[in-house]
UniProtKB/Swiss-Prot annotation:
The keyword Magnesium does not apply. It catalyses: UMP + ATP = UDP + ADP. It comes from Bradyrhizobium sp. (strain BTAi1 / ATCC BAA-1182). InterPro entries: AceGlu_kinase-like_sf, Asp/Glu/Uridylate_kinase, Uridylate_kinase, Uridylate_kinase_bac. CDD domains: AAK_UMPK-PyrH-Ec. It is found in: Cytoplasm. It holds the Pfam family AA_kinase. SUPFAM superfamilies: Carbamate kinase-like. This is Uridylate kinase. One of its GO terms (cellular component) is cytosol. The lineage of its organism: Bacteria, Pseudomonadati, Pseudomonadota, Alphaproteobacteria, Hyphomicrobiales.
Length: 238
């Protein structure tokens, strides 16, 4: 078995993926399978933090299009990520592995506040750190949150888990001629307008020299495979 390429990473999970085959809510079987993948990856000797989205509950942009102000809609979306964060933390803990939920919002009855010190401590103690609440500020996506948190905690890469095996020139489900890229620079990803992450996330990754690895999480063990450099995906770096 190949040695891991990285020793500390941030994994970005979409809220929509946590819904599994449903259009809304949390599919426990999907959450449990992701928990298994994270635990197996951690056993490779890797420190893992996870940023979860909230699109399976609330999407701030969609709510704001219905008359709610954008800051309020985004706050609703960020609170939805905390629910997903708690669900994933609980699934990991039920399987006997240590996990720590941290939120960008002060909510002591629910979980600890995210600080760099708290994240470093939890990772050093061997916990899988699950991050909710986005950045705590409106107008920023959870993709940007993942890059921001990775830079803050000194992670070596961001693993962007999706339902496709990398970055394509077009939607491969709609265009059979779509080309998959093995590598892109951050600037190429921004200029190409690829929808896998927003431009702010790519720009911050470029500024902080953080590689982003885009891969499909559909197959069990995909996270560990990518960390060993054995999986199929797109590396965005340089």
């Amino acid at each position: 078995m190949a040695e891991p390429v990285y020793r500390r990473v941030v994994v970005k999970l979409s809220g929509e993926y946590l819904a599994g085959p449903h259009s809304f809510g949390i599919d426990q079987a999907t959450v449990d399978r992701i928990a298994d993948d994270l635990i197996a990856a951690q056993k490779l000797g890797i420190e893992i933090a996870v940023v979860v989205g909230g699109g399976n509950m609330v999407r701030g942009v969609e709510v704001s299009s219905q008359g709610v102000s954008r800051p309020t809609g985004d706050t609703m979306g960020m609170l939805a990520t905390v629910m997903n964060c708690l669900a994933l933390e609980a699934a990991i803990q039920r399987k006997g592995a240590p996990a720590q939920a941290l939120s960008a919002f002060v909510m002591p009855q629910v979980c600890e506040l995210f600080t760099r010190a708290a994240a470093h401590k939890a990772l050093a103690e061997g916990r899988i750190v699950v991050l909710g609440g986005g950045t705590g500020n409106p107008y920023f996506t959870t993709d940007t949150t993942a890059v921001l948190r990775a830079a803050e905690i000194g992670a070596q890469a961001v693993l962007k888990a999706t339902n496709v095996d990398g970055v394509y020139s077009a939607d491969p489900k709609k265009d059979p001629a779509a080309k998959r890229f093995d590598r892109l620079t951050h600037s190429q990803a921004i200029e190409g307008g690829y929808k896998v992450m927003d431009a702010t996330a790519f720009a911050l990754a470029r500024e902080t020299s953080l590689p982003i690895i885009v891969f499909s999480i559909a197959e069990p063990g995909a996270i560990g495979a990518m960390l060993r450099g054995e999986g199929r995906g797109t590396i965005v770096a340089g």
